[in-house]
Amino acid sequence: MFSFAPVLVLLVIGNSEAGPYARDSVDRLQDIGLANLESHLARLPRASGCSLETAIKRKEWSSLAVEERLDYINATKRLANKPPRYSMDEVPGTRSRYDDFVATHIQQTLSIHFTAKFLSWHRYYVFAYEQALRDECGYRGYQPYEHWPYYSSDPLNSPVFNGNDSSMSGDGAKVAHDGIPFGNITIPPANGGGCLLGGPFKDFEAHLGPVASRLKDVPPNPRKDGLGYNPRCLRRDINPESSKFTSETYTYDLITKNKDIHSFQTSMQGDMQRSNPGVHGGGHTTIGGDPGGDFFNSPADPAFWLHHAMINRT
């Protein structure tokens, strides 16, 4: 549980020059944006200590040292072992501080997607999660992001999803399941769909939901609102057909071809009429499974936070 109190934070998304991937056209757009921001700040009186030099700097996952990735992974697990702030009367299924964030998203889903609040709400949401990791779990860094274009052609072999000890875990076991309909298209299933096969989150549990699972065999929640206790494994179907919608071209065009916030948010979130899931929907369906593929319950998969940190960056 967290409060949307007013907060002013100057955030700089760090580039990934030290990572193994060549910087692309989207990275170069960031360079232009930072130069414009620096010019803008230079014209303003320094009423506070905020500057590019003092700003929070978030890093791309592949540019983090292994020790930094492990620090983030361990902080996430510590948050999942801390007691919740929601009471059992408010959210009967919550069992951890991590679940607090999931419950908040479930309860507000319908007012924070496909509305004007989408970007601002999720920006603060990721910030609040980042602060919880730092203030409550001893995390020394800031929320990392995944630069989708680096991995869009082969997400399963990316440092995010390759399943090694410094990844966010990888795919789930092979389980037959349906594709993902979106407008006039259906994204075919990939080769997962079951419980995680390995990696640091293999034994991580989802406790809430499902509310709108795309998988038909997920045990139902005892409550209609999805807030009852329903412990189960994390399931994924890492899908390269979905990740095509997060490619360099899709991301670059999203930023450069939408001239107002309405068209930008609409294109980003997904346009059902044009059968385009957008980078937002494409990123979520790349993770897929349960809870990652559940519109309401997706934050219950820790990969959510890297995806939405990139939404913030974009």
Regions found by a protein language model. Give the residues of each.
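C-terminal accessory segments of proteins
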Residues: 19-314
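Fungal secretory targeting signals
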Residues: 1-24
